[in-house]
């Protein structure tokens, strides 16, 4: 994924210019409540809406709707993906706790946040030209770390694992001649593991700019730019 090195450079070079305490909160006080609108690029341009709500304790919930284009043969279609997940986060120091080696005790600081999410994902294609084989709802998992200064620049590294809905030709010439779906939509045989990185610039306590890139073995690589 050719843009990943550039995004990595942006994350680490801009972190050096961060203003400590700009928003008057701890540098590792990462927020998990947000409402965002993102522009996406994955072969075709699209958009996504994301809502994240912090719950009691270390838990939070996320909802996302993503719509973009899919090319199949000589035609283009819209694909809508809805995702709902329950997540939990914790500082790495709190997660691992104190480590002991004989008489030597090591205290691990909360240098970054560890997070994990699990939920369901559904996919749908536009029009009546598709017949979805099987269940269009499937499990979705996401896990990663957040690091940097929550007052200014933050970075994120994550792994997103779920099956993807793909298009295939039904191969039925009679069906193609009549009013019935000539194409089938089905889930990929294996989980698609997307590795991604992101950068967030916190403008103030209510606003932030967001850039994310992730790779995929089943679909096109994905880029997100949002607010």
Predicted regions: what is each one?
Residues 5, 11, 16-36, 97-108, ...:
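Outer-membrane beta-barrel biogenesis signature
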Residues 21-22, 58, 90-97, 105-217, ...:
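Outer-membrane beta-barrel transmembrane domain signature
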Residues 47-51, 221-226:
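A short acidic, amphipathic alpha-helical/loop segment
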